[in-house]
């Protein structure tokens, strides 16, 4: 009977013990910060993983206006670049202008004799890249012809006029002699000459202007020769004219000679444009020009260039992000986010990083929560936080350096005859965009994977550092927490945090407390064994008592037992 009572008391004592309720132990948990609502990013292994913070890498909107700083932006208003170069009367204001970017408006129009340029895109690109309409007149000698022809389709003020940079030559009296003119280039730069040929609408107009039934224009240099014959015939009426002028251009290198031979229909140059090599360009846009600063310009307006990618427009000028198809790419700049649970752990608010993050920790990425004789507390570990931040800082700049190539992408224009070239160019551009879009997504996924891995690694480093400090003075409780087997006040906790903890000071106390607590702190497996042993002994004692009672009753004659065979 005494044995039963002792076993019952022992079992009750085992279950009633709470080793953490005394003042001679403490609990320390390590964790990382978390936010209630994180940001989803893509990594190599996961399409969607939540992180505490992320930065958008794709610029998807413009500011709606074109900034005039740091580039000199010239508003073409009602003039195209070619009209300004030829000297259309309503574009005289642009003579001798300079620009970094010439803006052509959709409202631009020609207001002179109707013309066409067989290689319009090339001429436009050459003039645009020069960045100037600086013009130098030269003393061409045209003998036996009438100069400075004009037309009612090209009025300057109230008088008939013509393109100011061209000289329309017609008959003088009843003759149009063969013209042979040379002009050497004795300068050390390239000269751009603009000339043309007139296509009358009828044979009568041809002979009326040039005497000959068919003229011819030949322009030559040491490197090239162009011979053009007029195509006489009626064309759709434009500004009262059914004739046309075809504009051509010739570049004369230093030391070369320009030679012009013609017996009619010549629209002669008056001088040359000085060729310059630069990064100037031309762009079609209806966005307003305003006083602001932006290093990247698109037809939609200027955009910031602090992101490596943009989805605003393929056509750009300046220091611009790479164009990609994606509307969004997010670069992880924080750690993996595990929102804090409402109820957890035996200590309520104290739970380690294995279980979840801590939303209340705002002064660092990693830190400690503890419970000791002085209460509970929390503190950030600034060293591990700074180590993670140092590795993440500069990621955005590195991505920009890898992708943000400083260049300008001009518009591509092709005539109908060049349809195959246009298709090929479009295919090449689309392929480049597809390739960059894939590379961008892969690059960001790799960087995100690296960020998450390194922040996880910093958490593990802090845990291992703490474990090595505590040694046998504490036990890993799992979930990122330690049970410290000695009295550890706030100063002691602080020494663990800053790495000055000396486990030898507390070793004897910890070992003594560990043995005392381990003697009664039985884990669930041992408790089960004690329960089974206690149950078996109790049953045995009950049987012994019952058997003894029966034997005693038989001896007294109170119970009679007959055995028959």
From Swiss-Prot:
Residues 1-16 form the signal peptide. The keyword Endoplasmic reticulum does not apply. GO terms for cellular component: host cell plasma membrane; membrane; viral envelope; virion membrane. The record marks 344-345 as: Cleavage. Residues 551-565 are cytoplasmic. Glycans are attached at residues 23, 37, 53, 78, 180, 300, 498. It comes from the Viruses. Residues 17-529 are extracellular. Keywords: Clathrin- and caveolin-independent endocytosis of virus by host, Clathrin-mediated endocytosis of virus by host, Disulfide bond, Fusion of virus membrane with host endosomal membrane, Fusion of virus membrane with host membrane, Glycoprotein, Hemagglutinin, Host cell membrane, Host membrane, Host-virus interaction, Lipoprotein, Membrane, Palmitate, Signal, Transmembrane, Transmembrane helix, Viral attachment to host cell, Viral envelope protein, Viral penetration into host cytoplasm, Virion, Virus endocytosis by host, Virus entry into host cell. Palmitoylated. In natural infection, inactive HA is matured into HA1 and HA2 outside the cell by one or more trypsin-like, arginine-specific endoprotease secreted by the bronchial epithelial cells. One identified protease that may be involved in this process is secreted in lungs by club cells. It is a single-pass type I membrane protein. InterPro entries: Capsid_hemagglutn, Hemagglutn_HA1_a/b_dom_sf, Hemagglutn_influenz_A, Hemagglutn_influenz_A/B. Disulfide bonds join 29-481, 67-292, 79-91, 112-154, 296-320, 488-492. Pfam families: Hemagglutinin. Major glycoprotein, comprises over 80% of the envelope proteins present in virus particle. The extent of infection into host organism is determined by HA. Influenza viruses bud from the apical surface of polarized epithelial cells (e.g. bronchial epithelial cells) into lumen of lungs and are therefore usually pneumotropic. The reason is that HA is cleaved by tryptase clara which is restricted to lungs. However, HAs of H5 and H7 pantropic avian viruses subtypes can be cleaved by furin and subtilisin-type enzymes, allowing the virus to grow in other organs than lungs. Binds to sialic acid-containing receptors on the cell surface, bringing about the attachment of the virus particle to the cell. This attachment induces virion internalization either through clathrin-dependent endocytosis or through clathrin- and caveolin-independent pathway. Plays a major role in the determination of host range restriction and virulence. Class I viral fusion protein. Responsible for penetration of the virus into the cell cytoplasm by mediating the fusion of the membrane of the endocytosed virus particle with the endosomal membrane. This is Hemagglutinin. It comes from Influenza A virus (strain A/Equine/Kentucky/1/1981). The lineage of its organism: Viruses, Riboviria, Orthornavirae, Negarnaviricota, Polyploviricotina. The gene is HA.
């Amino acid at each position: 009977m005494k044995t039963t009572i002792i076993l019952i008391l022992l079992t009750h004592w085992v279950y009633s013990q709470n080793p953490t309720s005394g003042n001679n132990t403490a609990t320390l948990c390590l964790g990382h910060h978390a936010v209630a609502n994180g940001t989803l990013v893509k990594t190599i292994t996961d399409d969607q993983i939540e992180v505490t913070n992320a930065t958008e890498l794709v610029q998807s909107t413009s500011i709606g206006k074109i900034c005039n700083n740091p580039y000199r932006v010239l508003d073409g208003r009602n003039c195209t670049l070619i009209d300004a170069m030829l000297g259309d009367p309503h574009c005289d204001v642009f003579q001798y202008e300079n620009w970094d970017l010439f803006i052509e408006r959709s409202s631009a129009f020609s207001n002179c004799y109707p013309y066409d340029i067989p290689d319009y895109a090339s001429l436009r690109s050459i003039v645009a890249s020069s960045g100037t309409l600086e013009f130098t007149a030269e003393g061409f000698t045209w003998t036996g012809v009438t100069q400075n022809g004009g037309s009612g389709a090209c009025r300057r003020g109230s008088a008939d006029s013509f393109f100011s940079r061209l000289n329309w030559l017609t008959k003088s009296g009843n003759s149009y002699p063969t013209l042979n003119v040379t002009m050497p280039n004795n300068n050390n730069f390239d000269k751009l000459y603009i000339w043309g040929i007139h296509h009358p609408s009828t044979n009568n107009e041809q002979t009326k202007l040039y005497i000959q039934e068919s003229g011819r224009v030949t322009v030559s240099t040491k490197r090239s020769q162009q011979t053009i014959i007029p195509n006489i015939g009626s064309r759709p009426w434009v500004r009262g004219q059914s004739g046309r002028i075809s504009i051509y251009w010739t570049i004369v290198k230093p030391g070369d000679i320009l030679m012009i031979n013609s017996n009619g229909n010549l629209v002669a140059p008056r001088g040359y444009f000085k060729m310059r090599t630069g990064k100037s360009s031309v762009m079609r846009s209806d966005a307003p020009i305003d006083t602001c600063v932006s290093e990247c310009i698109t037809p939609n307006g200027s955009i910031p260039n602090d992101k490596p990618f943009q989805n605003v427009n393929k056509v750009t000028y300046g220091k611009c992000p790479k164009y990609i198809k994606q509307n969004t790419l997010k670069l992880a700049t924080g750690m993996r986010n595990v929102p804090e649970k409402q109820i957890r752990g035996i200590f309520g608010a104290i739970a380690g990083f294995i279980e979840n993050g801590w939303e209340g920790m705002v002064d660092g990425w990693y830190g400690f929560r503890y419970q000791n004789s002085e209460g509970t507390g929390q503190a950030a570990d600034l060293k591990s936080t700074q180590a993670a931040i140092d590795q993440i800082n500069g990621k955005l700049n590195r991505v920009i350096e890898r992708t943000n190539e400083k260049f300008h992408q001009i518009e591509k224009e092709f005539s109908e005859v060049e349809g195959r070239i246009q298709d090929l160019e479009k295919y090449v551009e689309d392929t480049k965009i597809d390739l960059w879009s894939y590379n961008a997504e892969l690059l960001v996924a790799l960087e995100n994977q690296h960020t998450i891995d390194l922040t996880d690694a910093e958490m593990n480093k802090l845990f291992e550092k703490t474990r090595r400090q505590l040694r046998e003075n504490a036990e890993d409780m799992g979930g990122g927490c330690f049970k410290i087997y000695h009295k550890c006040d706030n100063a002691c906790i602080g020494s663990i945090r800053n790495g000055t903890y000396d486990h030898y000071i507390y070793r004897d106390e910890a070992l003594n407390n560990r043995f005392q607590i381990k003697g009664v702190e039985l884990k669930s497996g041992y408790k089960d064994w004690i329960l089974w042993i206690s149950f078996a002994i109790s049953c045995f004692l009950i049987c012994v008592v019952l058997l003894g009672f029966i034997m005693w009753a038989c001896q007294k004659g109170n119970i009679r037992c007959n055995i028959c065979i």
